[in-house]
């Protein structure tokens, strides 16, 4: 299997499909999943002639289960290691949830200064800041994330069933069509990763203030968010991010969940393609 070794000797797994001379689209997955969460998008774009790449974040999926470095700076640096190893240029970076935070940090710190980024997309993304603080009074209280940590530590396998069965895909809403395969695939991806990485990752996605990252991004950036996102509430994420981006476009989806890339893939794929081609 293909791996890139980072500067701190962490092996990062990646998938690389399509013509090597085509425009690359790089996908950054959410917590606690893997590059497999992008199957619907990768198949769609590779069939359109693009080169598609998705890596597993450190401690997630097939990447090394290291003890340290489960923070946004290392996430972004690991992504840059993949980009450099594959010499990707003119790339579109698409991030979901925590992966959206990874994209924002990567573009701001590495990709944009190196001239390797054409566009960025933040889907149901965590920036600018999820945690409630004095400067972010609309955020979620720390007790919410402490609850995540306790549930993970007490019984990770059950927690990783409860999340996709309930709020992640909106399967807890009246009249929702529940897809058991989607639930099982979420659980499979989560359990493939490291409990330590997942535990530490809760702090990374909830407490990292990415206000300055967003302000520094100048490439065209598309912000997509479901209006019924029960995981990353839109009011404290996309509606704030769009005000910080210099060259941003916002599109919201009434009734759509945090996991809309999977359960509404046909709609999202069409919108992503339109942005990439614009």
From Swiss-Prot:
UniProt effect for mutating residue 229 to A: Loss of activity
Active-site residues (renumbered): 97, 229, 258
Effect of residue 97 to A/C: Very low activity
Domain called AB hydrolase-1: residue spans: 24-259
GO function term, MF aspect, one: chloride peroxidase activity
BP terms from Gene Ontology: antibiotic biosynthetic process
Keywords (A to Z) from UniProt: Antibiotic biosynthesis, Chloride, Oxidoreductase, Peroxidase
First-level EC class: oxidoreductase
Gene3D superfamilies recorded: alpha/beta hydrolase
A Pfam family recorded for this sequence: Abhydrolase_1
EC number per UniProt: 1.11.1.-
TM ranges: none
Domain of life: Bacteria
Family: Belongs to the AB hydrolase superfamily. Bacterial non-heme haloperoxidase / perhydrolase family.
Chain's role: Chlorinates and brominates suitable organic compounds. Involved in the biosynthesis of the antibiotic pyrrolnitrin.
Quaternary structure note: Homodimer.
Record-given protein name: Non-heme chloroperoxidase
Organism annotation: Burkholderia pyrrocinia (Pseudomonas pyrrocinia)
Lineage: Bacteria, Pseudomonadati, Pseudomonadota, Betaproteobacteria, Burkholderiales
Annotated gene: cpo
